[in-house]
């Protein structure tokens, strides 16, 4: 499938940092992170194909399609070498891009993503996908909330929970299911060792699907990485705790050679 001319936004100045959101999300999920980085980095956030303001080509999509979209955007904007940070599915797109285009990749942030899944991990994802296909995405939204956010955040910020759920509702069902299956079936274990650039691996202590065990595996497979586990958090780190993600991401990025 041909690359899609995705909707994007650029803020800041300095070395280019491309920010890649996850399933059923939007480029706006990075807003608070961008506010803390745009003094030193040219922050490029974009909507994945089929999401937000980007075109909606016919499904199914593949991980390679999503990599092609990122490469097309890099070429369009003319950045030779870029940092990439991705969340969840975006945390798979980033290292996969770095593997395909090592010359153009300065570093990768893998936030709340997964590799080295066990048979039980894969079975749980299969069950979630099957439930969405059989019962509809709307019927599973309640289970997503419990996976994505802590109980305290759910109680304190119902408007933010509803806004995130509305993003899911506004994503075409075939797109949401399609990118879920990309996330569920992608296994980075066979090739993570090929990603040679510096990497930040970060997740929440209580993220069920992208848990510390899986991120410790990622950290161990990458030749040059650091691991951060944020205590008490689940999956939606940028919504619930961008103030805790930002210092680690900023420190990591500033330490890289940006010449």
Residue spans for each PLM region:
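Alpha/beta-hydrolase fold catalytic core
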Residues: 1-18, 38-42, 79, 226, ...
């Amino acid at each position: 499938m041909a690359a899609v001319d995705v909707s994007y936004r650029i803020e800041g100045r300095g070395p280019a940092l491309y920010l890649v959101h996850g399933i059923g999300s939007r480029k706006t999920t990075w807003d608070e992170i961008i506010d803390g980085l745009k003094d030193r980095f040219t922050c490029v956030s974009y909507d994945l194909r089929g999401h937000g303001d980007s075109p909606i080509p016919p499904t199914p999509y593949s991980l390679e399609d999503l990599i092609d979209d990122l490469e097309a955007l890099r070429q369009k904007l003319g950045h030779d070498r870029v940092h990439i940070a991705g969340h969840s599915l975006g945390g798979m797109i980033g290292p996969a891009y770095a593997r395909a285009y090592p010359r153009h990749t300065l570093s990768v942030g893998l936030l709340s993503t997964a590799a080295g899944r066990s048979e039980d991990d894969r079975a749980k994802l299969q069950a979630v996908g099957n439930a969405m296909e059989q019962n509809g995405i709307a019927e599973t939204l309640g289970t997503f909330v419990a996976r994505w956010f802590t109980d305290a955040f759910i109680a304190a910020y119902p408007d933010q929970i509803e806004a995130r759920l509305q993003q899911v509702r506004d994503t075409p069902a075939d797109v949401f299911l399609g990118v879920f299956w990309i996330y569920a079936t992608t296994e980075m274990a066979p090739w993570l060792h090929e990603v040679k650039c510096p990497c930040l691996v970060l997740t929440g202590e209580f993220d069920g699907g992208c848990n510390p065990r899986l991120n410790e595996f990622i950290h161990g497979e990458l030749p040059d990485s650091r691991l951060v586990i944020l205590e008490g958090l689940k999956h939606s780190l940028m919504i619930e705790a961008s103030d805790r993600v930002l210092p680690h991401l900023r420190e990591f990025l500033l330490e890289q050679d940006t010449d």
